[in-house]
From Swiss-Prot:
GO molecular function: 4 iron, 4 sulfur cluster binding; iron-responsive element binding; metal ion binding; translation repressor activity
Cofactor note: Binds 1 [4Fe-4S] cluster per subunit. [4Fe-4S]-binding affects RNA-binding activity, thereby inhibiting activity of the protein.
Domain of life: Eukaryota
Record family assignment: Belongs to the aconitase/IPM isomerase family.
Binding site for [4Fe-4S] cluster: C512, C578, C581
Subcellular localization, as worded in the UniProt entry: Cytoplasm
Record-linked NCBIfam families: aconitase_1 (TIGR01341), PRK09277.1 (NF006757), PRK12881.1 (NF009520)
Main location: cytoplasm
Protein name listed in UniProt: Iron-responsive element-binding protein 2
Length: 963
């Protein structure tokens, strides 16, 4: 399917830029006059795209007029949007490209031309989520050799041998593991449960590795472990038009999107238009800080955009956020982010655009803005937009942007009134205006279980103690008063330490949110420098790591001279990509694990990301806090979160003098000076060279050269999915859901991590059994995220999260009841039995079903389990779109009702029918086997969603377009 022809209806608006016939644009302000002038900047971008793509079919003149009349039409109409480009990361990119490959097969089978199946817009796929930390500071973990790759071919790692003497770890006293093999035996059990039949030298290390080699070794293993996936990506870049793959080791999707792919203004042939983007990564919103409209959507919707269809959204309300005042000296952009997050959550901006204006905006750098914009999914907004202004232009100039293009960009943006100027006499009109005084924001962290639970650093000690007292919940651990002062001794690396409630055991500056912000990274480095120089250290049992977003972070930390000091404190670079943040953390030492279990301690992880859903880091780490990078370092030095930084010292110097946090906290002037000297130009130049040159391993990787992908039936990574098995040229009539059983009875805030985990594959899981039956050992399982190209693994991994709370079971476990037999089984095993019996399934849930990361397998998995509908109190929008996009009906209880109020136990049998004529918000009647009947709302927002559902989902709908 070709993309729509531009401007059929509004060709008369095309003008040349300053008389240059090679630079044309749609002069949209002429269309609306004063109506245009009061539009928020973000809505002006939507309007330009509508005008440019108006062909009377996919984009109608009525849609354009609705956007122009935003003031009266907001929240009341659906509008299409054609983004300029698409960005994928590999965790969600691989199922998207596998679906494309499978669609080619289906189109050919039904007599169509498979060559027509390719993206209609530029699509960039960044391989950034496959990194796992096999090699850390002091040694090499025995890395897996999965069925999909050969580690010896990938990196020719030297054989691992048992040694009878202590391994010479760099720094000796700062080794992160107990490396005295004399105290351990092969059968002692002091090694990771994910590593079998390997020499036991220390809990998670084997060979000593110099720091620079650590990154290379992790990359070697990454290429070996993911060889099949990488070959498939390389085939995709050659087989499909408009697909470019950014290879491993380059950086994260949102990082590369911001620093390399972003154009601000597109110049296609002779036409100028605003850059805009959608992608399968929730952090895609980061680019809004650069004045580029963009947000995260599901993999299924992204595929539709790639095939030339628009994204459809309700014309959003736009909340104007006026920033005033100046930030305090000790406040980082992360504190500003968390302050805005809490404020916007309280105001309520779900499903809305947020647009920033006011005098305070000009005081924020681009990296500050992108950090704020990156967090918008956490407060529920679709996006948070910072219009282009002089700060943006200066940033682009410093990053080496071509000056001629920069001049054209400025002229174009001013011509179409997309350039924000503090001297403007009037601001756009907004649906609502809120004010935030930057001076009122104080340093804070977020936790212990949810990112929205913000805690001022000054209140941290009292808040943690309150959490110990509270009943088990989002802010409670219910530790008996007489147990709260308990300590447990742990012997580590020849020394004795005490663990207690609040002890920090994981401290990670990870590759999410913060690494794009040089100021906070440099602040962490400066803090480390001052700490080391004054004699402070991190206790060796704390699992510390530094996982940068891209190579330029390493560059500026190194060139500024702070990297060695971070290393001295244990924050060594372990690789480039998502690791700790997606559950790929290396295990803690056995000594620490035993101590935690012995004392039933509430130990803590402190990380500089933006997500910390329960159980994500490590099962034994019950409290997890989000903090700015310098605070991560500070809490690591303190060794506990149960501390008042204002009144209690971090430690003592060599003379015994007490050292407080304010003694080593870097000033904003120090940070900004270092940022200017070591960051701006070189970091972007480095990434550009890295992306364009690739790397030796990627460049030498062989891939098939064919229109159709040659599926390997033995592959455990890439498999042709079954979504198109029953595809016909015409859709069948909607079928009723009759005599359905409830597969799971869930509560509130069920996340996509609960539904479709991205981390490691547990040995006892259904997915593990599948892989074992195909000859793989536990060391070769890899992660669910890495195996999203295999529908058999992902279906078995659906609802396999150990933290899943199913009310049928009464405790966290990936289990359910198969009611016909009364057996308690793994969720997959129960669903498999139901399918053999021909019994359809539904899911009962509470509020905010499907919250968290955008993850299309959280819909695909239940679909392949046989789930026909989900009945919940409310949904996360992206996940609801996914359910419709795969053919699952999203049903909602009537306002004020839920399963409890209706007296449902979940053990009933449910039946409902769909009328031939569906419409948005239609009420349906459900009958149960007990005789009880009740009404629910079919949560379809528009006719497009209804059409997709009738086709059996978006994939079937799109595939039929090629026939």
């Amino acid at each position: 399917m070709d993309s729509p022809s531009a401007g059929y209806t509004f060709e008369y608006l095309i003008e040349t830029l300053n008389g240059n016939s090679q630079k044309k644009f749609f002069n949209v302000p002429k269309l609306g006059g004063t109506k245009y002038d009061i539009l928020p900047y973000s809505i002006r971008v939507l309007l330009e795209a509508a005008v440019r793509n108006c062909d009377g079919f996919l984009m109608k003149k009525e849609d354009v007029m609705n956007i122009l009349d935003w003031k009266t039409k907001q929240s009341n109409v659906e509008v299409p949007f054609f983004p300029a480009r698409v960005v994928l990361q590999d965790f969600t990119g691989i199922p998207a490209m596998v679906d494309f490959a499978a669609m080619r097969e289906a189109v050919k089978t039904l007599g169509g031309d498979p060559k027509k199946v390719h993206p209609a817009c530029p699509t960039d796929l960044t391989v950034d989520h496959s990194l796992q930390i096999d090699f850390s500071k002091c040694a090499i973990q025995n890395a897996p050799n999965p069925g999909g790759g050969d580690l010896q071919k990938a990196g020719k790692l030297s054989p691992l041998k048992v040694q009878s003497k202590k391994l010479p770890c760099r720094g000796q006293t700062t080794c992160r593991g107990s490396c005295d093999s004399g105290e351990l035996s092969r059968n002692s059990g002091t090694f990771s449960s994910q590593i079998e039949n390997t020499p036991v030298l220390c809990p998670f290390h084997l060979q000593p590795v110099p720091e620079p080699e650590t990154v290379l070794k992790n990359q070697e293993v990454e290429f070996g472990r993911n060889r099949e996936r990488l070959q498939f990506f390389k085939w995709s870049s050659g087989a499909f038009k408009n697909v470019a793959v950014i290879p491993p080791g380059t950086g994260m999707a949102h990082q590369v999107n911001l620093e390399y792919l972003s154009r601000v203004v597109f110049e296609e042939t002779d036409l100028l238009f605003p850059d805009s983007v959608v992608g399968t990564d929730s952090h895609i919103t980061m680019v809004n800080g650069l004045g580029i409209l963009g947000w995260g959507v599901g993999g299924i919707e992204t595929e539709a955009v790639m095939l030339g269809l628009p994204v459809t959204l309700t014309l959003p309300e736009v909340v104007g956020c006026e920033l005033t005042g100046s930030s305090n000296a000790f406040v980082t952009s992360i504190d500003i982010v968390l302050g805005i997050t809490k404020h916007l959550r309280q105001v309520g901006v779900a499903g809305k655009f947020v647009e920033f204006f006011g005098s305070g905006v000009s005081q924020l750098s681009i990296v500050d803005r992108t950090t704020i914009a990156n967090m918008c999914p956490e407060y529920g907004a679709i996006l948070s937009f910072f219009p282009v202004d002089n700060v943006t232009l200066r940033h682009l100039e410093h990053t080496g942007f071509d000056k001629t293009k920069l001049e054209s960009m400025e002229k174009y943006l001013k011509a179409v009134k997309l350039f924000r100027n503090d001297e403007n006499s009037s601001e756009p009109e907004y649906s609502q205006v809120i004010q935030i005084n930057l001076n009122s924001i104080v340093a804070s962290v977020s936790g212990p279980k949810r990112p929205q639970d913000r805690v001022a650093v000054t209140d941290m000690k009292s808040d943690f103690q309150a959490c110990l007292n509270e009943k088990v919940g989002f802010k409670g651990f219910q530790v008996a008063a007489e147990k709260q002062s308990d300590t447990v001794s742990v012997r580590y690396d020849g020394s004795e330490y005490k663990l207690s409630h609040g002890s920090v055991v994981i401290a990670a500056v990870i590759s999410c949110t913060n690494n794009c912000n040089p100021s906070v990274m440099l602040a962490a480095g400066l803090l480390a420098k001052k700490a080391v120089e004054i004699g402070l250290r991190v206790k060796p049992y704390i699992r510390t790591s530094l996982s940068p977003g891209s190579g330029m972070v390493t560059h500026y930390l190194s060139s500024s001279g702070v990297l060695p000091y971070l290393s001295k404190l244990g924050f060594d670079i372990v690789g480039y990509g998502c690791s700790t943040c997606v559950g790929n953390t290396a295990p803690l030492s056995e000594a620490v694990l035993n101590a935690v279990k012995q004392g039933d301690l509430v130990t803590c992880g402190v990380l500089s990301g933006n997500k910390h859903f329960e159980g994500r880091l490590c099962d034994c780490v019950r409290a997890n806090y989000l903090a700015s990078p310098p605070l991560v370092v500070a809490y690591a030095i303190a060794g506990t979160v149960n501390i008042d930084f204002q009144t209690e010292p971090l430690g003592t110097d060599s003379t015994g003098k007490e050292i407080y946090l304010h003694d080593i906290w870097p000033s904003r002037e120090e940070v900004h000076q270092m940022e200017e000297e070591h960051v701006i130009l070189s970091m972007f130049k480095t990434l550009k060279e890295k992306v364009e040159m690739g790397n030796k391993r990627w460049n030498s990787l062989e891939a098939p050269d064919s229109v159709l992908f040659p599926w390997d039936v033995k592959s455990t990574y890439i498999r042709c999915p079954s979504f198109f098995d029953k595809l016909t040229k015409e859709p069948a009539a909607s079928q009723p859901i009759e005599n359905a059983h409830v597969l799971l009875y869930l509560g509130d805030s069920v996340t996509t991590d609960h539904i479709s985990p991205a981390g490691s594959i547990a040995r006892s899981s259904a997915a593990a059994k599948y892989l074992t039956n195909r000859g793989l050992t536990p060391r070769e399982f890899n992660s669910y995220g890495a195996r999203r190209g295999n529908d058999a693994v992902m279906t078995r991994g659906t609802f396999a999260n150990i933290k899943l709370f199913n009310k049928f079971i009464g405790k966290p476990a990936p289990k359910t009841i198969h009611f016909p037999s009364g057996q308690t089984l793994d969720v997959f095993e129960a669903a498999e039995l139901y399918q053999k019996e021909g019994i359809p399934l539904i899911i009962l849930a509470g509020k905010k079903y499907g919250s968290g990361n955008s993850r299309d397998w959280a819909a695909k998995g239940p679909y392949l389990l046989g789930v026909k509908a989900v009945l919940a109190e409310s949904y996360e929008k992206i996940h609801k779109d996914h359910l419709i996009g795969i053919g699952i009906a999203p049903l909602e209880f009537l306002p004020g009702e839920n399963a409890d109020s209706l007296g449902l136990s979940g053990r009933e049998v449910f039946s409902l029918s769909f009328p031939e004529e569906l419409f948005p918000g239609i009420t349906l009647n459900i009958k149960t086997s007990t005789g009880k009947e009740f009404s629910v709302i079919a949560s379809f927002a528009n006719d497009v969603e209804i059409t997709l559902y009738k086709h059996g989902g978006l994939l079937n709908f799109v595939a039929r377009k090629f026939l």
